[in-house]
Amino acid sequence: MTLDEIAKLAGVSKTTASYVINGKAQKYRISEKTQHKVMAVVEQYNFRPDHAASALRAGNSRSFGLIIPDLENTSYARLAKLLEQNSRQAGYQILIACSDDDPQIEMAAAEALVSRRIDALFVASGIPSASEYYLKLQQSGTPVIAIDRALDDEYFSCVISEDFGAAFELTRSVLTQDVHSVGLVGALPELNVSREREQGFAMAVKQRGLPTTLGYGEHFNREEGRKVFAKWVANDQLPDAVVATSYTLLEGILDVLLEQPELMQKVRLATFGDNRLLDFLPIRVNSLPQQFELIADSALALALNASAKRYQTGIELIPRQLKVRT
């Protein structure tokens, strides 16, 4: 059943039928008699207007896309939930895809989302040449909002948490007088976010002139964190303090410590990210929680502006809050 058929059966114009069905009868002073005629046909044939088709004709779909690296990562899961809630409250749906930090999967997801005529795309990219790829996509008509991992701010809107300065402060928080060596457990060193965190780490350690050990996994996940840390332990190369560049990597470190609890007395830990469970561990772990609400609010504001043809380039830095556990 189409709108044309509804109008013919009700004996009114297509425009009049549309006004009645979409709740605009009072605005256009359509009589109650005409309203009843139209709605009687609507109810008889169980007609449902195709809002998606209407939105596409109007040039928008009232939907956003979101690509994140890992749905099991509590930080990204929290951010996805907030963006979905905020988008829904603004009258938008959000379509979510997971890249697993695989460039091919991410590009396929981006193309699939763009094919759905989304009004803007949020992405935490794991593509080494992400700015180049997403610039082509953006020039084809879909605004891109970078979250958590920045793109080239000359061309893109970016909302990220501070990385270089945060890594500096986090590292410095574990450099007590009894620390004589420091390690960094990270992943995907080719990503800009990884470089920023390593540089902040290096700057803090340089001030003390301490030897460092760097270990990088292939992904930001628990297993990779475990591999790096376990290798240090097996080779008798465990530093006095270790900084993890994500909470998921820290989980792998904690797995090793659970198996060898005597090591808890030999190492100080710090991590990007946070979890309430850290408050209950026998080992003290300093952490860097993100302000997810601020990130989600800022990202949505940028997306709404972009969908209204008011795209703004630049980086918005959301400060982190160092949590020192003593």
From Swiss-Prot:
Q: Which InterPro entries match?
A: Fruct_sucro_rep (IPR012781), HTH_LacI (IPR000843), Lambda_DNA-bd_dom_sf (IPR010982), Peripla_BP/Lac1_sug-bd_dom (IPR001761), Peripla_BP_I (IPR028082)
Q: Which CDD domains does this one have?
A: HTH_LacI
Q: Where is the HTH lacI-type domain?
A: 1-58
From the record, give the cysteines joined by S-S bonds. none
Question: Induced by what?
Answer: Expressed at the highest levels in fructose media. Expression can be modulated by CRP in the presence of fructose and glucose.
Q: Which SUPFAM superfamilies match?
A: lambda repressor-like DNA-binding domains, Periplasmic binding protein-like I
Entry keyword Heme: no
Q: Which residues bind DNA?
A: 3-22
Q: Which GO terms describe its biological process?
A: regulation of DNA-templated transcription; response to fructose
Source superkingdom: Bacteria
Gene Ontology MF: a single term: DNA-binding transcription factor activity
The record's section on SMART domains has:
HTH_LACI
Q: Which UniProt keywords apply?
A: Activator, DNA-binding, Repressor, Transcription, Transcription regulation
Q: How is its activity regulated?
A: Interaction with F1P may induce a structural change in the DNA spacer region between the -35 and -10 elements, thereby facilitating RNAP binding to the promoter to trigger the transcriptional activation of the fru operon. Interaction with F1P does not release FruR from its binding sequence.
> Which Gene3D superfamilies does the entry link to?
3.40.50.2300, lambda repressor-like DNA-binding domains
Self-association or partners: how does it assemble? Homodimer.
Q: What does this protein do?
A: Regulates the expression of the fruBKA (fru) operon, which encodes proteins involved in the import and metabolism of fructose. In the absence of fructose 1-phosphate (F1P), binds to the promoter region of fruB, interferes with the binding of the RNA polymerase (RNAP) to the promoter and represses the expression of the operon. In the presence of F1P, activates the transcription of the fru operon by facilitating the binding of RNAP to the promoter. Essential for the expression of the fru operon and thus for growth on fructose.
The name on file for this protein is Fructose operon regulatory protein
To which species is this protein native? Answer: Vibrio cholerae serotype O1 (strain ATCC 39315 / El Tor Inaba N16961)
Query: Its encoding gene is what?
Result: fruR
